[in-house]
Amino acid sequence: MTRLLFVAILFTLLLAACAGSRAPATSSQPAKVSVPGGSYTNVSATQLKAMLDKKDFTFVNVHIPYEGEIAKTDAFVPYNEIENNLGKLPADKNAKIVLYCRSGRMSAIAAKTLVRLGYTNVWDMEGGMIAWETLGLPLKTK
């Protein structure tokens, strides 16, 4: 019986260790994400709001289909058509580009693509427009 109890406790601890969840970033500092070919920077909706007050970057919505936009968006480039739309992005691969989508999934894919293409100053808004709206911030529609 003791052996069975020991195995049950061990199994429970193992499950608990493997079931960890990724908590949302709460740091006040953007976080670097390493990917093949370099890295990009994750930024929260709160951090992006402050960045937009002194905008010094190209702001790109990569979500498809169109579901709205954040004010001051410079371009719309579908996340899966980045390579075919480089003309909509800065020619300078060191220029700061901030990406967003609806939830963060598409923009993360786009960020990895830009890094693979040699862009060195790529930023991705975690949580996308959903995180933006959660803060009570508005979206625009065409």
List the model feature ranges, each with a label.
Residues 2-8, 13-57, 64-96, 105-142:
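Rhodanese-like catalytic fold shared by cysteine-dependent sulfurtransferases
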Residues 100:
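Short, surface-exposed ligand- or partner-binding patches at beta-edge/loop junctions that are enriched
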